[in-house]
């Protein structure tokens, strides 16, 4: 089902979770608006969106792909990964910074070759929420990040 057709479910929800979708839409605000119409008053929406900061290395990869004229085909993805592994792309000399998705063909396509990608800053996220009269409740951080932010000793990260 297309997210913009979610009203066709003819249901409203207490909680809506949307991850990995809005940032690939032509107009994420339009997608969010469609979801809000299916949310009960006082309900919650949990969003998973791309971060401008967190994806800085992915942006470098996407720029390299564009410069090389590579396509999101299996051959194009393999050629890109081969160039990274062979050290031909100096900005991307460390594949682990691209994450585990880099090593799977379908995941790498979504990671680096997707035709539509919006990335959010805290300011643009707040603007999106304000435009839709939503209240920001907080970020859900991975445990590893929580350890970094809540503990000053590097030894606790081992």
Where are these regions (language model features)?
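Rossmann-like AdoMet/SAM-dependent catalytic core
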Residues: 80-158
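A short acidic, Gly/Pro-enriched loop at the edge of an enzyme's catalytic core
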Residues: 4-16
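A short glycine-rich, Lys/Arg-flanked "PGG" loop and its adjoining helix->strand segment in the class I
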Residues: 29-44
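Beta-sheet entry/capping signal
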Residues: 14-15, 41-47, 133-138
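Conserved class I S-adenosyl-L-methionine
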Residues: 44-95
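Short secondary-structure boundary/capping segments
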Residues: 12-14, 32-34, 52, 60-66, ...
């Amino acid at each position: 089902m297309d997210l913009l057709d979610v009203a066709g479910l003819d249901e409203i929800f207490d909680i809506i979770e949307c991850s990995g979708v809005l940032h690939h839409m032509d107009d994420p605000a339009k997608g969010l608006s469609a979801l809000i119409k299916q949310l009960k008053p006082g309900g919650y929406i949990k969003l998973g969106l791309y971060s401008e900061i967190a994806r800085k290395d992915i942006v470098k990869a996407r720029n390299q792909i564009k410069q090389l004229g590579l396509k999101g085909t299996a051959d194009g993805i393999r050629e890109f990964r081969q160039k990274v592994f062979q050290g031909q792309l100096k900005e991307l000399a460390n594949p682990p910074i691209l994450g585990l998705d880099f090593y799977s063909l379908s995941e790498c396509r979504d990671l680096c070759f997707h035709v539509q990608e919006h990335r959010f800053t805290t300011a643009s996220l707040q603007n999106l929420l304000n435009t839709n009269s939503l209240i920001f409740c907080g970020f859900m951080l991975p445990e590893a990040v929580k350890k970094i932010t809540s503990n000053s000793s590097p030894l606790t990260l081992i």
